[in-house]
Design a protein with these regions (language model features):
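Buried hydrophobic packing segments
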Residues: 88-91, 161, 198-206, 230, ...
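Rossmann-like adenosine-cofactor binding region
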Residues: 249-339
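N-terminal ligand-binding/catalytic initiation module
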Residues: 1-188, 411
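General beta-strand structural signal in soluble alpha/beta enzymes
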Residues: 90, 146-148, 171-177, 220, ...
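Adenosine-phosphate binding glycine-rich loop
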Residues: 2-10, 205-206, 310-420
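Glycine-rich phosphate/diphosphate-binding loop of Rossmann-like nucleotide-binding domains
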Residues: 181, 186-288
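Conserved active-site and cofactor/substrate-binding residues in soluble primary-metabolism enzymes
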Residues: 10, 14-17, 83-86, 120-131, ...
Length: 420
């Protein structure tokens, strides 16, 4: 079972440490540091929900706006038993830098509700979503803060959020959230965007490092939206996906898993458990497999100082947010592992969310080929920007990405000044 936090360091401590490292490397002015290090707004809400039994259960919800100097706050909503305020603050912080790295006009936001959606009915999830949306309604809006899907939230949940907001306004407001169903103003290609963006950064890494995708041995930790799509695209490019895991099982086949069949099995059963033609292994064994590309696509702090030395790979592609702790970063640097940092690797999702927002605001929609072509251009350009800084400043890729993102946010704050 994968957990969100470890005893080593919580996600927000990781975010702050990585900020300080980048700010030091940039020699950032102390006044700018003070302006952009911490969240602008932090909201905690009580969310009472009438369950199917008639009992009223109270859930804890959060919405954090980290920085809006470059545009409206942007970031997903997650439903998970381990959601905490510190986790949401960390994710909002990373969203600020992520949007800046891919140079889209958004700031960083994030939200979540501490709940177990797997044990809730569709009706209970709808009630929870509408109550939570009503509670954070003063903070959100197409020009203020635009939520999106995240862990265990779906296009249907985004549709309920959009409807709740619209009912309060008295007219349809499609652009208040992204990741919606296409029938409600969602964008073609949005569902695959995070995994597709990850794939593009892996391609770019391979080109620069001389590691071709064809024949590369891949391990995927986390087989949700991002992990499964990345695995599918790599499999289509003739990589060999040796192993995959979700919250219930880790499986391995030395000759390569049949990814199309594995995706169908997961859709049918909700789990990787019981997939034929695969050996069950432990999560620890999965991370220690000899491979060329490791994709941590689950939750934060999956790879720490305790297990990083057991990892045997050439590339780590962070499809999840914050899966590698600073101590694990240092170990990977010692071992010569090339890491594609989360704020670059998984930025495909927010990039196509931006496309969706643009399409909703303009009432003009693009076909899927246009969406994917625009995404590839942005992800490739952004990778090249980070890789260039990595080489010029002789810093690791995470520090280079943070320097690029934080530098752009700092410049926006500097140009805007301080009001009043």
């Amino acid at each position: 079972m994968l957990t969100t936090l470890t005893a080593e360091m919580n996600a927000y401590q990781v975010a702050l440490e990585n900020f300080d490292l980048a700010a030091d490397a940039l020699d950032l002015d102390p006044s700018l540091r003070a302006m952009i290090k911490y969240p602008e707004r932090v909201l905690s809400v009580s969310v009472p929900v009438r369950m199917d039994t008639g009992q009223i259960v109270r859930f804890e919800g959060y919405r954090v706006q980290h920085n809006t100097a470059r545009g409206p706050a942007k970031g997903g909503i997650r439903y998970h038993p381990n959601v905490t305020m510190d986790e949401v603050k960390a994710l909002a912080t990373w969203m600020s830098w992520k949007c800046a790295v891919v140079n889209i006009p958004f700031g960083g936001g994030k939200g979540g509700v501490t709940c177990n959606p797997k044990r809730m009915s569709a009706g209970e999830l709808e009630h929870l979503t509408r109550r939570y949306t009503s509670a954070i309604l003063p903070l959100i809006g197409p020009e203020k803060d635009i939520p999106a899907p995240d862990v265990y939230t779906t296009p249907q949940i985004m549709a309920w959020m959009m409807d709740t907001y619209s009912m309060h306004k008295g007219y349809p407001v499609h652009s208040v959230v992204t990741g919606k169903p296409v029938s409600l103003g969602g964008s073609l290609g949005r569902n695959e965007a995070t995994g597709r963006g990850c794939f593009y950064t892996i391609q770019s890494s391979g080109s620069n490092l001389g590691i071709p995708v064809k024949g590369a041995r891949v391990v995927v930790q986390g087989f949700g939206n991002a992990g499964s799509i990345a695995a599918h695209l790599l499999d289509s490019a003739q990589a060999v996906v040796l192993a995959a895991s979700d919250s219930t099982a880790a499986i391995f086949n030395r000759h390569g898993l049949d990814i199309p069949k594995l995706i169908m099995h997961k859709e049918r059963t909700g789990s990787l458990s019981g997939f034929p033609a695969a050996e069950t292994i432990t999560p620890e064994e999965l991370l220690s497999l000899d491979c060329d590309i490791l994709i941590p696509a689950a939750l934060e702090n999956a790879i720490t100082g305790d297990n990083a030395r057991a990892v045997h790979t050439r590339i780590v592609a962070e499809a999840a947010n914050g899966p590698v702790t600073p101590e694990a970063d240092r170990i990977f640097a010692e071992k010569g592992v090339f890491l594609i940092p989360d704020i670059l690797c998984n930025a495909g999702g927010v990039t196509v969310s931006y496309f969706e927002w643009v399409q909703d605001e303009s009432h003009l929609f693009w076909d899927e080929n246009d969406v994917n072509a625009k995404l590839e251009r942005i992800m490739t350009r952004s990778f090249n920007d980070v890789f260039k800084l990595h080489q010029e400043r002789n810093v690791n890729m995470r520090l280079a990405a943070n320097m690029l993102g934080i530098g752009r946010v700092a410049e926006a704050c500097r140009m805007r000044g301080l009001y009043p």
